[in-house]
A protein has these predicted regions:
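Iron-sulfur-associated redox domains of electron-transfer enzymes in respiratory
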Residues: 1-198
């Protein structure tokens, strides 16, 4: 988690791996009980899990999920990484580098001492398997939290099809979509500093 604007940088960008919840729910509850405003962002199942853990609503909690494709098996990621790179030599990983645009994104592995590995979606075996649902977690295939059922205040998504709906807003680096799902979200939204079109 982060309590600073500068800390948000590490949380940005797509991460096509399973996240570790660890003590996140406990930290969230502690912050909420102290009266701090908490924005919890996670997969739909993580939002649902947090709500079950908390067992009550908090006015100072804002929950955000995203349209989730599913989560790949951590074992597959580990195998891929071990075959592709020495993990102690990795500087940064980008699962969705947009140098070629958001419709033809690339997997980029930056090393500390050697040339970076850059492969498009069509060439990278890890991304291909993920996009084609070959190695998602078994629970993802029967997810009960997808389709706006997690109880989140907001849902984020890529605005695929914007070329057809709002062609004048199209951007080769992508456009995001924000959906308000709850009354709490409707109350919060006017106070948010968001650039965009409603």
């Amino acid at each position: 988690y982060t309590e600073s604007i500068s800390g948000l940088e590490k949380l940005r960008m797509s991460k096509y791996v399973q996240s570790k919840i660890g003590l996140s729910f406990i930290h969230t509850e502690n912050f909420l009980k102290k009266g701090k405003i908490v924005m919890f962002v996670g997969t739909p199942c993580q939002i649902h899990g947090l709500k079950l853990f908390l067992r009550k609503d908090y006015e100072n909690l804002i929950t955000v999920d995203f349209v989730c494709h599913g989560v790949p098996s951590p074992k597959i990621w580990k195998i891929y990484l071990n075959k592709t790179a020495k993990t102690n030599d990795i500087k940064q990983i980008s699962f969705r580098n947009k140098k070629l645009g958001w419709e033809n994104f690339s997997f980029v592995l930056q090393y500390k001492k050697q040339k970076s590995l850059s492969e498009t979606l069509r060439k990278n075996p890890y991304l291909r398997g993920f996009i084609h649902d070959i190695y998602l977690r078994p629970c993802c295939y029967v997810c009960k939290n997808k389709s706006f059922k997690s109880g989140s205040d907001f849902t984020l998504a890529d605005f695929w099809g914007i070329k057809n709906t709002y062609p004048n807003l199209y951007d080769k680096n992508g456009i995001s979509c924000l959906t308000i799902n709850t009354i709490h979200g409707m109350e919060i939204f006017p106070n948010m500093n968001i650039q965009g079109t409603q």
